[in-house]
A protein has these predicted regions:
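N-terminal small-domain helix-loop-helix segment of the aminotransferase-like
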Residues: 1-88, 95, 268-269, 371-373
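PLP-dependent enzyme catalytic core of the Aspartate aminotransferase-like
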Residues: 77, 316, 325-334, 340-373
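Conserved PLP-anchoring active-site segment centered on the Schiff-base-forming lysine
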Residues: 81, 99-121
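Helix C-cap/helix->beta junction micro-motif
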Residues: 124, 184-185, 295, 330, ...
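Active-site phosphate-binding strand-loop segment of PLP-dependent enzymes
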Residues: 135-202
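Active-site PLP attachment segment
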Residues: 210-243
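Structural signature of PLP-dependent enzymes
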Residues: 244-251, 266-289
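Conserved glycine-rich beta-strand-loop-beta hairpin in the small C-terminal domain of fold type I
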Residues: 264, 280-289, 299-313
């Protein structure tokens, strides 16, 4: 397999530990273990009681019954048996795409967005057409272009809701039209939902609640602020779940007892996490809006209830070298937009802890003005 390096992961692997002010990450301000244990109102007693009686064996190979039940509650019409635990959203995407794509098949993928959604099918031998989204449309997809791209042999349509790094959300009415287009050629639809909107969730519907040949991927990493658990999932119909069961034996076997117990506990306490994270989204988005209003060299399309965003930078320098200079000179970390095929900008992880965001933005402004004005 000839597979490309994931641009954003490569950049973060190389540079994130050098950062003093990390405003590049897409997770909503990661929880500490102490904060996680306080979620149950009993100092973590419910987690400790469950974990302390578990043997440190392989555990439930495809996720415990409790984990599957908690995930199924996130959807309207999901059989818990068709929930499969994966190694984060990354493992979920890998297994889902491998279960659908074959050499020579045709795939349509939203672009630009999270790179594995279009590069993985290509690495597996598919012919991939990019369904390009445009800034002038507020990063919303053009359905007429999707209709032109699908073919009788289209096997899969890949979308990202919300988009990483753009923060654009696909509402239910648009997703329903995507489903109708997929049905017209009997294609699967994979929707990476790790950034599923926390704000106004009634305006969006998971692909698995709209389409039998829909598969969603998700994890506790982004909306639930616990990426350390490395616990994600796929939800699909039984046909695809059975294919992924076979693949899991090659790619992971299991997520591990500790991760399963922790993820189950997090999902059981999701209401408290969502309340916390909605407050972070709203507070920090307003901080960035106010900063943007006074910063002539930056602009953005505000994200809608999700933790990831992209900002344009009006600077006489390519974004890659600028972000490296910024990091080395000030300690502020941004991901260059070119790592997402979005040059002249950067991914802004605006859901960092508030004090980090405020200092990071102030430092960024001072640096740009000193360097260019």
């Amino acid at each position: 397999m000839n597979i490309k390096t994931i641009g954003v992961e490569s950049f973060l692997n190389d540079y994130e530990h050098e950062a003093r002010l990390d405003i590049a990450q897409s997770t909503i301000a990661s929880l500490t273990m102490g904060e996680i244990l306080e979620l149950d109102g009993q100092g973590g007693a419910t987690f400790s009681d469950q974990h302390n009686k578990e043997k440190m064996n392989y555990g439930w190979i495809e996720g415990s019954a409790d984990f599957k039940q908690e995930v199924a509650k996130l959807y309207q019409h999901v059989d818990p048996d068709n929930v499969l635990q994966m190694n984060g959203g990354t493992g979920a995407n890998l297994n889902a795409i491998m279960a659908i794509v074959e050499p020579g098949c045709h795939v349509v993928a939203e672009y630009p967005t999270y790179q594995p959604l279009y590069d993985l099918p290509e690495a597996l031998g598919a012919e991939v057409d990019h369904w390009v989204i445009h800034e002038e449309d507020g990063w919303q997809p053009r359905l007429d272009e999707l209709k032109k791209l699908v073919r009788p042999d289209t096997r899969l349509i890949c979308v990202n809701n919300a988009s990483n790094p753009l923060g654009a959300v696909i509402t239910t009415d648009v997703m329903e039209e995507i489903v109708e287009i997929a049905k017209s050629v009997d294609a699967w639809v994979l929707c990476d939902e790790v950034f599923f909107p926390l704000e106004e969730p009634e305006k969006c519907t998971s692909i698995v609640d709209l389409y039998d040949k829909g598969v969603c991927t998700n994890s506790v990493s982004k909306d639930y602020s616990v990426p350390a658990a490395r616990c994600g999932w796929t939800v699909s119909n039984k046909e695809l779940a059975d294919r992924m069961r076979v693949l899991r034996d090659y790619t992971m076997i299991c997520s591990g007892v500790f991760n399963d117990t922790l993820a189950t506990y997090v999902l059981r306490n999701r209401e408290r996490i969502v309340e916390r994270n909605l407050n972070i989204i709203r507070t920090n988005r307003e901080i960035v809006n106010e900063w943007m209003a006074g910063e002539k060299r930056a602009s953005w399309i505000p994200p809608k209830g999700v933790s990831v965003s992209y900002m344009r930078l009006d600077i006489p320098q390519d974004d890659e070298s600028f972000c490296l200079d910024l990091l080395h000179d000030t300690g502020v970390l941004l991901v260059p937009g070119s790592r997402f095929d979005l040059p002249r900008g950067a991914r802004l992880g605006y859901c960092a802890h508030e004090e980090v965001l405020r200092e990071g933005l102030a430092t960024l402004s001072a640096y740009m003005h000193e360097k260019y004005d």
